[in-house]
Every structure is written in structure tokens, then in C-alpha cells.
């Protein structure tokens, strides 16, 4: 009897380990704000709190929330007093903590938008330059002076800091992340966001502004469960203004960063976004590279790629690099069934009324246990059609072509479809075998 109990206990332990491993892999990120969210009457945190159930129903595992601190710009991307959460235009610190607790009650982890490349000062120094920073506490934490600004940021620096390790940000002082006090106090602040506020991970804003080695320092010092960096890489374009077919240099930058930082660090797959939004306009041949793989970061390092259709910068009211609006669901059909970690944008679920279609695709992903490292086999990539099989369990078709011939095995059945996309899986509603037209 004791042996049977021990055996059953071992089997249960193995099952739990397998389940936890799967849950750790099966990630779907949701961006819980847009560029105008700060304007919401009654506060964005309170508004979003009322939609936690709706967001959970889409099947997401993580929600990305806006920058939490005081900021000169209302959206939060020009931060000043980092510990001052009550000065945020999105709501108070108490409202933020309540929102995070509500997401946690649904099993959803919360990712903070971390803006540390640059920082806005409260006061001028003797030179008349804004470079005296306040941390937002009664003590001296994050109370910095010009010594903490990169020496080559000559508009603000006193010349005593280290040179910048990344790209320049002209609108505010670039912080010297090689300064040991800066590293210590920012790490302490991040750990406070975890232990006191409740955040689980980080989205690193403008991560090109400091080196991967600097990012690694903060990741190692704070042990987040999820990290994704914004590295808006520069795609190559041909003379006609169209994206080049080969974007290896673009995606190599993303791969290099993720590998250098290590641990849980991933990067937004800007390469896939650029290729996909060009491809859905009659150029679906773009979605297979010279080695038969996906052309974006997911073709090389899918486990560290976060795919997306639009965000608060590329879409929303900024609209700086938008996905074709009439083809957004083709984009979601791709990212929600393919390797990588897909990110769903708030606007598309709520403002565009695409919640049901997106939720259906997310359910296909969950039901078939598609994960960041899932196996991708591209069956067709031509101008008007793209067909791919994922983990031998799901087939995705996007494009205008009506007849996909015999590419769909007879034991696959339609489980989702919409404007110029269709999804099949090995279980579900049975349809007649033979040729398929969608």
C-alpha cells in the first residue's frame, strides 16, 4: 500500500511539474493602455479594474501597465520622482495596487513599463540647468545631481559622468547607468515595485538607450519573472520604399540583445511586425526566409521574441507605424498561432470590438499548447496565400486566395475563420475531407 501511495505521489509530482513547465511557456501578453488612456475620467487604473474579467477572458497570462510614476509628460514617458506613484495621471498608488491585486486574483501577472534611460529634474543647478532630481521620498533615495548624467549629454551634464552606453535621448537628461549609485538605487526602486506595489516583470522602454550589459545588471539585481525590451530596430528598405526581403541585420540586433542580457529577457519582434504588415498587402511571400523559416526574430530565437500587431506608439493616436487597419485580424491569426509570445493591444480588443475573434484565436493557442518555442513548418508563402503548420496540431492560412488545394490534411478541421484567414486543428468541429476553400 505504501509503495502504491509513493508511486501515485511521484506521478502527481511529475504531472504538476509538467503543468508548471507548460504554464511557464504558454504566455500571452496584453497591453493594458494606449496613448490617450491618461485622460480617462475617474482614472485609468479604476477603469481598467472594471474590465479585469473581460481581459482575463481573452486568455492572457500577463498584462503590461503604463509607467507608474510622476512624469512631466502625462503618458508617463518623461519620469521624474520615481517613488511618487500618486502623481501619475493614470491614478493613485493605492488604485494601482488594487488593480494589480485584481489581476493576480485571476492568475495574471503584471508588467511595469520601466523608463530609466532618461529622467526629468525638479530643479535647476547653479548653471540654470534642470539637473537636480528628486526621488519622491523624504530621504535621499534617487535624489541625484548632474554627476548622474552621461558626460556626452552636453545639454545637461557637468562632464563628470561616464559616456552614454547607448543611443541619445534629446528631450531629457540621459542617465549614467555606469554610476554605481545609479545602479544601486534604481535596482532598489525596481525591487520596491515588486515587493511593495506587486509588479512581476518589466517592459524596458527605449532599451537602445543603454547597453545590454546595463540591462543585464538590472535584470540580475531584480529577478523579474518576465522582461521584454523595446528595441525599435531599423529595417532595411529598397529604393522603391518597400521593406527589403532580407531583414537579417534587423533581427540580429534583437537576438544579440536578448542573448547578451540572458535570463528571462525577451525583445519585441519589430522585424516580424514590419514584414507582416507589408506581407498582408499581397506580398505574403515575405513570410518565409531563404532557409524556409519565419523572417522575423521568431525565425531565429522564438523563445525570446514578443510578437505584436500595434502598440501605443505604432498605433493608437500616434499612429507612427500602423498595421493596415482592414487586415489586423490576419495579423492576429498569425501571431496567436505562431511561435513567440504574442502581445494583444487594448485598442483592438475594446475600441475595435475584436474581443470575440481575438479570444477565439487565443483559445486555439491555449487548447493546442502552442508556446514560444513551438515547431513551425511553412507549407506555402506566395503573394496571395500563406499556410503554416504549428506543432503538427494547428494550420494557419492567411491571404486572399480562396483555394488552398490539398495543403490541409483530411483530419484537420476548421475552428476559427474571418476575413481572409482560417485556422484548422486536429480536434474540433469536423468538416468534409478533401479540398478546402477559405
Curated annotation (Swiss-Prot):
<feature type="active site" description="Nucleophile">
    <location>
        <position position="205"/>
    </location>
</feature>
<feature type="binding site">
    <location>
        <position position="209"/>
    </location>
    <ligand>
        <name>Ca(2+) 1</name>
    </ligand>
</feature>
<comment type="function">
    <text>Important for breakdown of endosperm starch during germination.</text>
</comment>
<keyword id="KW-0732">Signal</keyword>
<dbReference type="GO" id="GO:0005983">
    <property type="term" value="P:starch catabolic process"/>
</dbReference>
<feature type="binding site">
    <location>
        <position position="169"/>
    </location>
    <ligand>
        <name>Ca(2+) 3</name>
    </ligand>
</feature>
<feature type="binding site">
    <location>
        <position position="312"/>
    </location>
    <ligand>
        <name>substrate</name>
    </ligand>
</feature>
<feature type="binding site">
    <location>
        <position position="167"/>
    </location>
    <ligand>
        <name>Ca(2+) 1</name>
    </ligand>
</feature>
<comment type="subunit">
    <text>Monomer.</text>
</comment>
<comment type="similarity">
    <text>Belongs to the glycosyl hydrolase 13 family.</text>
</comment>
<dbReference type="InterPro" id="IPR017853">
    <property type="entry name" value="Glycoside_hydrolase_SF"/>
</dbReference>
<feature type="binding site">
    <location>
        <position position="397"/>
    </location>
    <ligand>
        <name>substrate</name>
    </ligand>
</feature>
<feature type="binding site">
    <location>
        <begin position="203"/>
        <end position="208"/>
    </location>
    <ligand>
        <name>substrate</name>
    </ligand>
</feature>
<feature type="binding site">
    <location>
        <position position="139"/>
    </location>
    <ligand>
        <name>Ca(2+) 2</name>
    </ligand>
</feature>
<dbReference type="InterPro" id="IPR006046">
    <property type="entry name" value="Alpha_amylase"/>
</dbReference>
<feature type="binding site">
    <location>
        <position position="174"/>
    </location>
    <ligand>
        <name>Ca(2+) 1</name>
    </ligand>
</feature>
<feature type="binding site">
    <location>
        <position position="232"/>
    </location>
    <ligand>
        <name>substrate</name>
    </ligand>
</feature>
<feature type="active site" description="Proton donor">
    <location>
        <position position="230"/>
    </location>
</feature>
<feature type="binding site">
    <location>
        <position position="318"/>
    </location>
    <ligand>
        <name>substrate</name>
    </ligand>
</feature>
<feature type="binding site">
    <location>
        <position position="117"/>
    </location>
    <ligand>
        <name>Ca(2+) 1</name>
    </ligand>
</feature>
<feature type="binding site">
    <location>
        <begin position="77"/>
        <end position="78"/>
    </location>
    <ligand>
        <name>substrate</name>
    </ligand>
</feature>
<dbReference type="Pfam" id="PF07821">
    <property type="entry name" value="Alpha-amyl_C2"/>
</dbReference>
<feature type="binding site">
    <location>
        <position position="234"/>
    </location>
    <ligand>
        <name>substrate</name>
    </ligand>
</feature>
<feature type="binding site">
    <location>
        <begin position="70"/>
        <end position="72"/>
    </location>
    <ligand>
        <name>substrate</name>
    </ligand>
</feature>
<keyword id="KW-0479">Metal-binding</keyword>
<feature type="binding site">
    <location>
        <position position="168"/>
    </location>
    <ligand>
        <name>Ca(2+) 3</name>
    </ligand>
</feature>
<feature type="signal peptide">
    <location>
        <begin position="1"/>
        <end position="26"/>
    </location>
</feature>
<feature type="binding site">
    <location>
        <position position="424"/>
    </location>
    <ligand>
        <name>substrate</name>
    </ligand>
</feature>
<feature type="binding site">
    <location>
        <position position="134"/>
    </location>
    <ligand>
        <name>Ca(2+) 2</name>
    </ligand>
</feature>
<feature type="binding site">
    <location>
        <position position="293"/>
    </location>
    <ligand>
        <name>substrate</name>
    </ligand>
</feature>
<feature type="site" description="Transition state stabilizer">
    <location>
        <position position="313"/>
    </location>
</feature>
<feature type="binding site">
    <location>
        <begin position="402"/>
        <end position="404"/>
    </location>
    <ligand>
        <name>substrate</name>
    </ligand>
</feature>
<dbReference type="InterPro" id="IPR013775">
    <property type="entry name" value="A-amylase_pln"/>
</dbReference>
<dbReference type="GO" id="GO:0005509">
    <property type="term" value="F:calcium ion binding"/>
</dbReference>
<protein>
    <recommendedName>
        <fullName>Alpha-amylase isozyme 3B</fullName>
        <ecNumber>3.2.1.1</ecNumber>
    </recommendedName>
</protein>
<keyword id="KW-0106">Calcium</keyword>
<feature type="binding site">
    <location>
        <position position="174"/>
    </location>
    <ligand>
        <name>Ca(2+) 3</name>
    </ligand>
</feature>
<dbReference type="InterPro" id="IPR006047">
    <property type="entry name" value="Glyco_hydro_13_cat_dom"/>
</dbReference>
<dbReference type="InterPro" id="IPR012850">
    <property type="entry name" value="A-amylase_bs_C"/>
</dbReference>
<feature type="binding site">
    <location>
        <position position="172"/>
    </location>
    <ligand>
        <name>Ca(2+) 3</name>
    </ligand>
</feature>
<feature type="binding site">
    <location>
        <position position="153"/>
    </location>
    <ligand>
        <name>Ca(2+) 3</name>
    </ligand>
</feature>
<feature type="binding site">
    <location>
        <position position="143"/>
    </location>
    <ligand>
        <name>Ca(2+) 2</name>
    </ligand>
</feature>
